[in-house]
Amino acid sequence: MTKINWNQLAAEQVNPKMKRKFIHGEKVMIAKMEFEDGFIVPWHSHENEQITEVFEGTLRFWFDHDDEHFIDLLPGDSIIIKGNRPHKALMIGKVVETDTFSPPRQDWIDGSDNYLRK
């Protein structure tokens, strides 16, 4: 068992418009994210199942390389994304959200998540 205080974790500045903190065990990871208005998470997919919950702002998701249809998540909304499903996202306003992944995102742990570091 490990006790962690989020307030004592340093935020990683992944790029000029994205900060995150995350913790993980062997089978699950949770990340607290902050994005500036207009940031786009480009098309990507990963083996990990993902649950996203929005606390502030609007997070717009597109799925399956379909740029015409989208889903907006507002504060209090959550979405479950199955593993290997292509998606991208746009931040409308300042966005504060959490992402939970199972299994943990190894590319985030080892810093090889280059698609976010541009």
PLM feature spans:
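A cytosolic small-molecule/anion-sensing beta-strand core signal
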Residues: 55-56, 74, 93
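A short, N-terminal "cap"/entry segment at the start of jelly-roll beta-barrel domains
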Residues: 1-27, 94, 114-118
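Ligand-binding loop in jelly-roll beta-barrel domains
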Residues: 83-107
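Short acidic-glycine-tyrosine-enriched beta hairpin
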Residues: 67-83
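Histidine-centered metal-chelating micro-motifs
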Residues: 40-41, 60, 79-88
